[in-house]
Amino acid sequence: MKDNIELTIFTPEKNIKIGEIKEVITEGLDGDLAILPNHVNMITYLKPTITKYIDLNGNKNNIFTSSGVLKVEDNKVYIICDASEKPEDIDIKRAENARKRAEERLRNKKEIDVKRAELALFRSIARIKIKEL
């Protein structure tokens, strides 16, 4: 049995190899997921959220992950998503403006894609929350 898992995040712009860690906590469509060493192999959809991971020194880390897919296979965790950002890389003004635009679109539901506006709102809120941590 292995004591660690390996985390890699793939986006269209970049691959983020976090490396060996103790645990990943993220949010799937049905709620929170905690992935520990020797987790059963699985694939699930993810919501835009703050993904948390604990490194080998026990430090808690956060990274924004947008909607996507999580795959667990043989103590390797792969997150494939549209975007991923570390807290220090998030432009808070841009995230706040995106939240305001999404909220306005949802208030005026005429001729908009509600699901798309909701996802934009979820992404912006997660980005804002991670900056507040």
From Swiss-Prot:
GO molecular function, one term: proton-transporting ATP synthase activity, rotational mechanism
BP GO terms, sorted: proton motive force-driven ATP synthesis
Subcellular localization: Cell membrane
InterPro entries xrefs: ATP_F1_dsu/esu_C_sf (IPR036794), ATP_synth_F1_dsu/esu (IPR001469), ATP_synth_F1_dsu/esu_N (IPR020546), ATP_synth_F1_esu_C (IPR020547), ATPsynth_dsu/esu_N (IPR036771)
Domain of life, source organism: Bacteria
Pfam families cross-referenced by the UniProt entry: ATP-synt_DE, ATP-synt_DE_N
PANTHER family reported for this sequence: ATP SYNTHASE DELTA/EPSILON CHAIN, ATP SYNTHASE EPSILON CHAIN, CHLOROPLASTIC
The family this protein is said to belong to: Belongs to the ATPase epsilon chain family.
Protein name per the record: ATP synthase epsilon chain
Origin species: Clostridium botulinum (strain Hall / ATCC 3502 / NCTC 13319 / Type A)
